Amino acid sequence: MSATLVIVDMQKAMDDPRYGKRGQPDAEEKVAALLGHWRELGNPVVHIRDNSLDPESPYAPGRPTHAFKPEVAPLDHEIIVDKQTNNAFIGTDLMQVLEDIGSIELVICGVHMQYCVESTVRMAGNLGFMVFVPQDCVVAVDQTDRTGRHWTAEEVHALQLSILEGSFCKVLNSEDLISANGSETLQ
């Protein structure tokens, strides 16, 4: 079975200014290319949609920003898993979906690196999946820590990927995934 592409929270809400300055300005384009390749090969795709319980959140159902970004929107036959936490496995049927597909390898991309992507990657790794993260297909935003230090989106992106790599996932570029995905395994 080919790897399953899991796209996390690629909704219009990701552009809301309340999340701060974002990095990876080409991420949507890169995810769209990866998604197009997955579709051409007939490989499984799962879209994760944030259904925030906070009615003021741009991710709240019913708000215009709750919609998927058009360039990575799911096709009618593609699976959508709705979540209400920062981890796509908690309180959802994602594990059952992946078991039904027969997935052992996951390619996880989306937003935001330091929140939902990180939580989902960690959980997937802990559950025994072989996880791949295309570094050019995940978006981080600026972060200020409790001491008041400001971290740019680029710094957050690099730090988060370095923390996850090895213990929870393999980090690579989307071009590497596109060229490798025709094989039986990505390893």
Where are these regions (language model features)?
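Extracytoplasmic cell-surface/polysaccharide-interacting catalytic and binding patches
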Residues: 3-7, 11-12
